[in-house]
Amino acid sequence: MADQTISNVLNQPQWRCLESKIEKSTLHYGRFIISPLWKGQANTIGLALRRTLLSEVEGTCITSVKIKNAIHEYSSLSGVQESVHDILINLKKIILSSSFSGIFEGFLSVVGPKTVLASDLNLPSFIKIVNPDQYIATVNKPINFNLQIYIQKGKGYSLKNPISIKQGFFLVDPVFIPIRSVNYSIHSFEDEKATKEFLIVEVWTNGSIEPKEAIKEASYNLVNLFTPLVSQEYQQLKNQLFKEDEKNKELNFIETNSNAISDNENSYNLYNQIFLDQLELSSRAYNSLKKNNINTISDLLKYSYEDLLKIKNFGKKSADQVIEQLKKRFKIQL
């Protein structure tokens, strides 16, 4: 029993960090593995995770700025080397990190002559500047140089911000994407006569979030996306079956869910939500079953071994494969 429990745990997909390093303050790298996976699952997870990392992970940016004495975006400021447009571009390059959502205010007030850097900004204590050496402007005369900025957390691209319509404020055109790049690769291996896969994911961030945390956030977003699609009844059934499996009991849908299913319902209804592709049959066997309107495990359980042999183009080899997969995956003896 203990050996079987250990085997069940080892067969559950698990994440592990293979490598983590800081190449520079604005470039953090992480390499991860998830294994074991059934054939085809690695590509499904890799594609969904990559797209979610690049579009759904939140970032913190300066969204708008008010510059004293600035008339319009392409105007020049007396005593300042850069135009307003150049200052906005430099502010956009500042990388911020914050665990709080909302709109926050920051200030900058210096007296020239001075080279103005991101480290000269006065921000709330919970907002960290990842690249404090980021250049903003050069004040080449003994004048006051003042900025008022707004900071916000968001996802993806923001081309419009209500704050920017206030008089004297300029939109910084922020990009709320802390992920610089994502790569994934799929590798196969043999396990107990079955071909399985493992997924390698590489993540580069701008330093405002660690790759490991980005993976977690993207995974949570995917879970939250699919959760509403799962009915309450099916979720309860899944939870009950998981508990039974952890106790190393036979995977018997009827017995483990007797309290959730009325007496007049037959056992096949429990398998209506499990489709044939979960058995990973050969193309010939799968197509033959589909042609005979056998789409779910529930449909399949209506057939005996002898009945399967009577199906056109469904030979003994295919029937034996069905028997083996039902027993292996669902502990069902047809």
Swiss-Prot record:
Residues 263-334 are annotated as: Alpha C-terminal domain (alpha-CTD). One of its GO terms (biological process) is DNA-templated transcription. The keyword Transcription applies. CDD domains: RNAP_alpha_NTD (cd06928). Disulfide bonds: none annotated. It is found in: Plastid, Chloroplast. It is an enzyme of class 2 (transferase). One of its GO terms (cellular component) is mitochondrion. Residues 1-233 are annotated as: Alpha N-terminal domain (alpha-NTD). The keyword Chloroplast applies. It catalyses: RNA(n) + a ribonucleoside 5'-triphosphate = RNA(n+1) + diphosphate. GO terms for molecular function: DNA binding; DNA-directed RNA polymerase activity; protein dimerization activity. It comes from the Eukaryota. Its EC number is 2.7.7.6. Gene3D superfamilies: 5' to 3' exonuclease, C-terminal subdomain (1.10.150.20), DNA-directed RNA polymerase, insert domain (2.170.120.12), RNA polymerase, RBP11-like subunit (3.30.1360.10). Keywords: Chloroplast, DNA-directed RNA polymerase, Nucleotidyltransferase, Plastid, Transcription, Transferase. The N-terminal domain is essential for RNAP assembly and basal transcription, whereas the C-terminal domain is involved in interaction with transcriptional regulators and with upstream promoter elements. DNA-dependent RNA polymerase catalyzes the transcription of DNA into RNA using the four ribonucleoside triphosphates as substrates. In plastids the minimal PEP RNA polymerase catalytic core is composed of four subunits: alpha, beta, beta', and beta''. When a (nuclear-encoded) sigma factor is associated with the core the holoenzyme is formed, which can initiate transcription. HAMAP family: RNApol_bact_RpoA. Belongs to the RNA polymerase alpha chain family. This is DNA-directed RNA polymerase subunit alpha. It comes from Chaetosphaeridium globosum.
